Amino acid sequence: MKFLFDLFPVILFFAAFKVAGIYVATTVAMVATVAQIAWVWFKHRKVDAMQWLSLLIIVVFGGATLIFHNDTFIKWKPTVLYWMFGVVLLGSAVLLRKNLIRAMMEQQVSLPEPMWGRLNLVWSLFFLAMGGLNLYVAYHFDTDVWVNFKLFGSMGLMVVFILVQSVWLARHMQERPAGANPQDDR
């Protein structure tokens, strides 16, 4: 359910684009993201840093798209988000010696230490590649193709990536004794 809730602005962007074009769709995405953040705030009194970041990026790039009447800005939005994720994952591992993928997943998954490093690297590279692919589609195809790619192509690639990763993880997962603390795996 959270996955669909997170996709809410993207789905509305897609629908608005099909009906009224890129500028209306951009406005709809901005309003939907603000509404989404407001809903999360009123319901939980807390908003994740990633949601704030997403709001900031849609407001900046969506705003630039509307102010300058140039859809190039909104087309850069996914790339900026993907590249930020990739750089943060890679940078935190290299510079801070902190594996963010492990921090997010270790409660659910028990892996040998070297696998956590590989998993973090693979996610980082995936996000960097997705950012590049988004730009390729944005600059080599028309806006209609880019919008379809944004919803179906990037989501499809994400699902395939997660499925392949799940198969890979299943081969390396360790049994954790009942009641064991994930911190003990370190």
From Swiss-Prot:
<keyword id="KW-0812">Transmembrane</keyword>
<comment type="similarity">
    <text>Belongs to the YciB family.</text>
</comment>
<feature type="transmembrane region" description="Helical">
    <location>
        <begin position="121"/>
        <end position="141"/>
    </location>
</feature>
<dbReference type="InterPro" id="IPR006008">
    <property type="entry name" value="YciB"/>
</dbReference>
<keyword id="KW-1133">Transmembrane helix</keyword>
<feature type="transmembrane region" description="Helical">
    <location>
        <begin position="3"/>
        <end position="23"/>
    </location>
</feature>
<feature type="transmembrane region" description="Helical">
    <location>
        <begin position="24"/>
        <end position="44"/>
    </location>
</feature>
<dbReference type="Pfam" id="PF04279">
    <property type="entry name" value="IspA"/>
</dbReference>
<feature type="transmembrane region" description="Helical">
    <location>
        <begin position="49"/>
        <end position="69"/>
    </location>
</feature>
<keyword id="KW-0472">Membrane</keyword>
<protein>
    <recommendedName>
        <fullName>Inner membrane-spanning protein YciB</fullName>
    </recommendedName>
</protein>
<feature type="transmembrane region" description="Helical">
    <location>
        <begin position="76"/>
        <end position="96"/>
    </location>
</feature>
<comment type="function">
    <text>Plays a role in cell envelope biogenesis, maintenance of cell envelope integrity and membrane homeostasis.</text>
</comment>
<dbReference type="GO" id="GO:0005886">
    <property type="term" value="C:plasma membrane"/>
</dbReference>
<keyword id="KW-1003">Cell membrane</keyword>
<keyword id="KW-0997">Cell inner membrane</keyword>
<feature type="transmembrane region" description="Helical">
    <location>
        <begin position="149"/>
        <end position="169"/>
    </location>
</feature>
